[in-house]
């Protein structure tokens, strides 16, 4: 994917969601004729991130399990927001949402991934922010959030 001009950064989120694969791996077990794959995507793609702007980017895991020709795959509806501001501690690694309303293999791996990520965040932080909305708005303000978070949950209000 060809990087765009950084001046177009704010307009990238208006029309469609951009993502690129950061990492992909798979395992195969011949006894059960099963394979398990995991990949991580980043939104926006790494080449779009402008480090001088205090915004977030998202890393989303995609899990795939295939047994006897039947495949389950689930993006987990789980997003980890990581700050591009180097001065912020890793405590601002925020798990926004997790959906477990899918097939059992996805349910199992979703819980496993969430547990590992939670432990990772807890290991490197003195505290986890209580209120995501307040923390995000207080640090980053409306200018950054408007293109990134069209959801009403992330609308920053004055005061």
From Swiss-Prot:
Subcellular localization: Membrane
Subcellular location, principal: membrane
Stretches that traverse the bilayer: 22-42, 45-65, 80-100, 104-124
Organism domain of life: Eukaryota
Statement: the UniProt record of this protein carries the keyword Membrane: yes
Keywords in alphabetical order: Membrane, Transmembrane, Transmembrane helix
Disulfide bonds: none
GO annotation, cellular component aspect: membrane
Its membrane topology: Multi-pass membrane protein
Protein name as annotated: Putative uncharacterized transmembrane protein C1235.18
């Amino acid at each position: 994917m060809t990087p765009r001009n950084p001046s177009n950064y704010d307009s990238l989120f208006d029309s469609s969601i951009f993502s690129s694969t950061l990492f992909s791996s798979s395992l195969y077990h011949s006894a059960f004729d099963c394979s398990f794959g995991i990949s991580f995507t980043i939104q926006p793609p790494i080449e779009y991130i402008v480090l001088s702007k205090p915004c977030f980017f998202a890393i989303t895991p995609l899990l795939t399990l295939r047994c006897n020709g039947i495949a389950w795959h689930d993006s987990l509806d789980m997003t980890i927001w990581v700050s591009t501001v180097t001065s912020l501690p890793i405590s601002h690694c925020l798990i926004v949402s997790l959906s477990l309303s899918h097939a059992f293999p996805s349910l199992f791996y979703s819980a496993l991934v969430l547990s590992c990520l939670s432990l990772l965040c807890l290991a490197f932080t003195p505290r986890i922010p209580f209120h995501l909305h307040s923390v995000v708005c207080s640090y980053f303000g409306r200018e950054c959030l408007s293109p990134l978070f069209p959801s009403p949950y992330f609308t920053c209000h004055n005061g």
